[in-house]
A protein has these predicted regions:
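Coiled-coil heptad-register positions
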Residues: 65, 69-72, 76, 146, ...
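Intrinsically disordered, low-complexity linkers and terminal tails enriched in Pro/Gly
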Residues: 1-9, 90, 177-182
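Negatively charged, low-complexity tracts enriched in Asp/Glu with abundant Ser/Thr
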Residues: 8, 26-79, 174, 178
Length: 182
């Protein structure tokens, strides 16, 4: 990545946008740990707990995204031709997307186009860049946690079905007269 010289850095000082800092993530880090992800799960309860932990983490990340959106819903960002919005997906999660106000077109291309326009004030370029980095990071974190939680919930259900089949077979063996194990 190309380094900016001192004059460019001075002209592009960040001002209106405050990116999320490590302290914003600390509560999420301490609320649930995924270090137990790589272990031999003994049953559907442990997987269901992992799915619940992921759901709590995802909600925490979405709250951080709300804080980000609150910033961009204030001037000077409300004067720009594009805005950052929430988009709910069919997979029942939410991501941050750029949307052009006039055309409703969405995507990172809208952000890039806004950055290239001479109408976009130079003093906002650093803020817009930091917003995009924050958007990318939060979307990645939300996606990962959502996927892990979804997989954990599906596996918990499959383990529950396997247990039901197993228990059904054991009960069948116990009720059958003269049944002998193999």
């Amino acid at each position: 990545m190309r380094q900016l010289d001192k004059n460019q850095q001075g002209a592009l000082q960040q001002s209106a946008f405050r990116p999320l800092q490590q302290t914003a993530f600390q509560a999420l880090q301490h609320s649930a740990s995924l270090k137990g992800l790589l272990k031999p799960f003994k049953g559907n309860r442990e997987l269901a707990q992992l799915a619940e932990q992921c759901e709590v983490l995802e909600q925490g990340l979405l709250e951080l995204a709300q804080g980000l959106l609150a910033q961009v819903r204030r001037p000077p960002f409300t004067l720009l031709p594009a805005r950052l919005i929430e988009q709910r997906t069919s997979a029942r999660t939410t991501f941050l997307r750029w949307q052009h106000i006039a055309t409703r077109r969405m995507g990172v291309g809208v952000w890039a186009e806004m950055l290239r326009q001479d109408k976009t004030p130079e003093y906002l370029l650093q803020d817009l860049y930091q917003m995009e980095l924050q958007r990318i990071t939060l979307n990645m974190q939300i996606s990962l946690i959502h996927s892990i939680g979804k997989q954990a919930a599906e596996c918990a259900e499959k383990m529950g079905q396997a247990e039901a089949e197993f228990m059904g077979r054991l009960q069948q063996s116990q009720t059958r007269p003269g049944s002998v194990g193999m």
